[in-house]
Swiss-Prot record:
GO terms for cellular component: cytoplasm; extracellular region; membrane. It comes from the Eukaryota. This is Proline racemase A. Pfam families: Pro_racemase. Substrate binds at G161, H162, D326, G331, T332.
Length: 423
């Protein structure tokens, strides 16, 4: 016989689905949502704690590094580069305030008051006997992006082509100057002791800041004096040189007059002859830039001869500093050589001139134009009223960043200010 269901049971079974759907299910659903939210919040909190610990460890490391550096009296950051083989160490920070109303005055102040910095950065143990570099400054001249004072193991230079090419490259590749969107050529203007140098970084196709090569438009260059006779000790004897300006004054001499072929094997002889020639020409010949009073010495000797590379017009080695030999074709030397050839009618405006270094690396150069400066004359000027002939020279080469360096000067280090074994 079938059992009858009491009204209460009947109501319970009929009402249960509604009760579950409207009362129990929301509770279960809410519990699941709360659990999900809790898990998400837990993960966020856990991630924040992990990030906080990571930051704390990084801060402790940074603080420890600062404590370690604090015991050093001086520290400098540098970009180490080379241009066609020649070193270019660019000091980007660490200098105290250097007074001066222009780069020439800053150069003079460094030379007279803080030359130990140059020695410490250029010479051993941080550098070497053929090191080259520059101090980077905020520009003073209007329109410039960077200020530069150039240095080597022997002192300071008013201008340097290979280091200017390096600076233009570094300025773009490290973000010192901004690169416009879709740019292919980026202008970088340098404020130097010799004047404004206008550079251009040529970007690799499809890249935003990778420089394929760089060009500089140098300060006005000119032939200063022609066929100057200089008598050197044996075995060299009497030689004839041209004196030209390309940012620095150069004594330009054919290698055949010295009886030395331009090769790495003959480097020590080339250095000896170059140093002898520079010393004698500064002793016996007075030079003076007609517009820049602080430029009044021959700083470099440019020895040139037949090229090895069929693409080149000539091959050279430039001796400067403390008997240093330029590994690149020398940018200011290329400018001086082109100014000399142009004055002699042996190079035309716009004609490509290729100079080869002792390593075999190349600079491409062009004379972009000429100008006469009325009332200004140098020894080769025939007509004072017509004025001195100057040319605008462009040099193109390739520079590479090799590393970023922090140099520390330990006050207890007996060699902190550098040394050289070269006598």
């Amino acid at each position: 016989m079938r059992k009858s269901v009491c009204p209460k049971q009947k109501f319970f079974f009929s009402a249960f689905p509604f009760f579950f759907f409207f009362c129990v299910f929301p509770l279960i659903s809410r519990t699941g949502q709360e659990k999900l939210l809790f898990d998400q919040k837990y993960k966020i909190i856990k991630g924040e704690k992990k990030e906080k610990k990571k930051n704390q460890r990084a801060n402790r490391r940074e603080h420890q590094q600062k404590r370690e550096i604090m015991r050093f009296k001086k520290s400098f950051t540098c970009i180490d580069m080379h241009t066609e083989g020649e070193a270019a160490r660019i000091v980007t920070s660490g200098l105290p305030h250097i007074p001066g109303s222009n780069m020439a005055e800053k150069k003079a102040y460094l030379q007279e008051n803080m030359d130990y910095l140059r020695r410490g950065i250029m010479l051993e143990p941080r550098g070497h006997d053929d090191m080259f570099g520059a101090f980077l400054f905020d520009p003073i001249e209007e329109g410039a992006d960077l200020g530069m004072v150039f240095m080597d193991t022997g002192g300071y230079l008013n201008m340097c082509g290979h280091n200017s090419i390096a600076a233009v490259t570094a300025a773009v590749e490290t973000g010192i100057v901004s690169v416009p969107a879709k740019a292919t050529n980026v202008p970088v203007v340098l404020d130097t002791p010799a004047g404004l140098v206008r550079g251009t970084a040529h970007l690799q196709s499809g890249t935003e800041s990778e420089v394929s090569n760089a060009s500089i438009i140098n300060v006005p260059s000119f032939l200063y004096q022609q066929d100057v006779v200089v008598v050197l000790p044996k075995p060299y004897g009497e030689v004839r040189v041209d004196i030209a300006f390309g940012g620095n004054f150069f004594a330009i001499v054919p290698a055949e007059q010295l009886g030395i072929d331009i090769s790495v094997q003959n480097l020590s002889r080339l250095q000896e002859a170059g140093e002898l020639l520079r010393t004698e020409i500064n002793r016996s010949v007075k030079v003076q830039h007609p517009q820049l009073p602080h430029i009044n010495t021959v700083d470099c000797v440019e020895i040139y001869g037949p090229p090895t590379n069929p693409e080149a017009n000539y091959k050279n080695v430039v001796i400067f500093g403390n008997r240093q030999a330029d590994r690149s074709p020398c940018g200011t030397g290329t400018s001086a050589k082109m100014a000399t050839l142009y004055a002699k009618g042996q190079l035309r405006i716009g004609e490509t001139f290729v100079y080869e270094s002792i390593l075999g690396s190349l600079f491409q150069g062009r004379v972009l134009g000429e100008e006469r400066i009325p009332g200004v004359k140098v020894p080769v000027t025939k007509d004072a009223e017509e004025g001195m002939l100057v040319v605008t020279a462009e040099i193109t080469g390739k520079a590479f960043i090799m590393g970023f360096n922090t140099m520390l000067f330990d006050p207890t280090d007996p060699f902190k200010n550098g040394f050289t074994l070269k006598q």
